[in-house]
Amino acid sequence: MKKNIFLLFILILVTVGVFAEAETKFILITDFAYYPKSSPVAMGLPQDDVSRFAPLDGFYSAVEARVTGKMDYKIPTPFGTNPLVKGNNVTISPALEISPVTLMPQFFVAFTPIAFLKFTASAKIGTGWDFIGIKGMGDLDSAENGYKSLTPFKNYFYEFRLSNLFQFDVGAIVPGDWTHVVMQASYDILYTGLTGVENGTPWIWQASGEKANGWNYYSQIILGYQMPLVLQTVGLQFELSGYYDEASFDAKYLDWNPSFMRVNINPICILKFNENHSLTIQTRFSSRRGFSSDRGEDATNFNLNYNGREWWFERVALSYSYSF
């Protein structure tokens, strides 16, 4: 009995010691994006596989804005004094994202077992509404009529995600202020859904459509160079995303190509003004489904036949981060 009490006492001391070293940081992130207009270019026959580029044909298509408040609670979990493992930690991060058309609480748990690896599990749930013609949440009425709005706080978007991240910095093996060539590569498995919407039915969330209940993937690679300047980082980001199974969408949308993999190429730069303030600037060249004919008066592309990848300049985005 005394032995058990002693072991419990030691466990309490260790636990208190670990949490006493924990760090808490609050982060406020403000995102804004501007989208110029780039109309789809129809070409070829349904059986073709035609790559194309859609030029800009208008100054304005849309804007996007949101604010995210987040708390990071970092618990040190060092496995030793080796540089690879002495910085190990578990970070617990509740967050709240607010946009003009959505409200979405989020929760993240990240574990860094070694300096160059990070594993993250996260969950999100949110609801949306319409505002000045922007649709926060809805499901497809028909390809001709587009999406119809769902009831806020009755229908909910949800996402569960598992992510692994590999990161490497040349500066870790070649010390110096100007040797920080960095690379990050990640792969995420996620399930997204909208309550009250039947499986196979397309839906829209945060004014972005062509989604359905089902398993998705998201992967990114970032190659960058960090400097001891206000312009801290310049780099190039590659993003890949899509649905694992075309059966996530109803069979009648098969010609639309449900399993299309979207590819984004994003030049980025990060301005770090001090330890608390930073600004990320990103431009995005993206790809979307190309079709052999124009959708005409239809509100969506779901009645069209996919016949290749179409590239276009999608947006310019700003993300301002303040931490304290």
Specify the residue positions occupied by each region the protein language model found.
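Solvent-exposed loop/turn segments connecting transmembrane beta-strands
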Residues: F59-R66, P94-F107, P113-F116, N213, ...
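Outer membrane beta-barrel
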Residues: D72-K74, N82-I132
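Outer-membrane pore/translocation modules
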Residues: K25-A54, A115-G224, N257-S259, K272, ...
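N-terminal ordered "arm"
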Residues: A33-N82
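Outer-membrane beta-barrel channels and translocator barrels
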Residues: K74-P78, V85-G87, T112-F116, G171-I173, ...
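Bacterial N-terminal signal peptides
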Residues: L8-V16
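Positively charged n-region of N-terminal signal peptides that target proteins for export
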Residues: M1-N4
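Transmembrane beta-strand segments of Gram-negative outer membrane beta-barrel proteins
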Residues: E21-V41, A65, N88-L96
